[in-house]
């Protein structure tokens, strides 16, 4: 990166994170980061352990998201923080709980990306409820909650993205389709 800085060439830098990392790790890259792209997958540590063997996930991920919200400066026209909410089968309530936490503890102005694309693989195929895709009802409960909490910035994948062949559907959402509040942001 130093040769780019020496030439005063500045490219947008996106920190793409599972959210399960320490704030001290994030601080090492704070000066480089233009946009922090964080996941909030679980709102319950027992789910995080069962699905990802990630003890203390909730505290770690929420601390990381809060740190990014408070510390990542806005540079360029990109938002400094985007939070991805992957709706998991049997755990839509946790996605809703994470949206509630974002709205009440940080801001409903944070852009969110609500995703339906969970596809069971490997050991998940043997582990209910992760052995199935998200139902349309589960997914709709989360998208409705996002609107209820006042989120208007971000993206909503079409439910059909739960089909692995269509997992990237929603990348270029047409006006009024898929974006929160009927607007693309």
Where are the language model's segments positioned?
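Auxiliary Fe-S-binding modules of radical SAM enzymes
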Residues: 73-80, 85-185
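Core AdoMet radical
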Residues: 1-72, 156
């Amino acid at each position: 990166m130093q040769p780019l800085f020496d030439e005063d060439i500045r490219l947008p830098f996106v920190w793409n994170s599972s959210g399960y990392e320490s704030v001290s790790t994030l601080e090492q890259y704070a000066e480089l980061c233009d946009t922090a792209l964080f996941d909030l997958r679980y709102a319950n540590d027992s789910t995080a352990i069962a699905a990802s063997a990630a003890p203390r996930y909730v505290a770690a991920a929420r601390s990381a998201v809060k740190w990014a919200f408070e510390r990542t400066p806005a540079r360029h026209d990109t938002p400094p923080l985007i939070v991805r909410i992957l709706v998991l089968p049997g755990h839509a309530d946790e996605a809703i709980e994470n949206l509630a936490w974002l709205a009440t503890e940080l801001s409903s102005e944070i852009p969110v990306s609500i995703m339906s694309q969970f596809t069971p693989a490997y050991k998940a195929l043997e582990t209910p409820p992760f052995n199935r895709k998200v139902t349309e009802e589960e997914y709709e409960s989360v998208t409705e909650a996002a609107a209820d909490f006042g989120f208007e910035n971000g993206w909503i994948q079409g439910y059909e993205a739960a089909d692995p062949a269509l997992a990237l559907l929603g990348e270029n959402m047409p006006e009024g389709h898929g974006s929160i509040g009927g607007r693309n942001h």
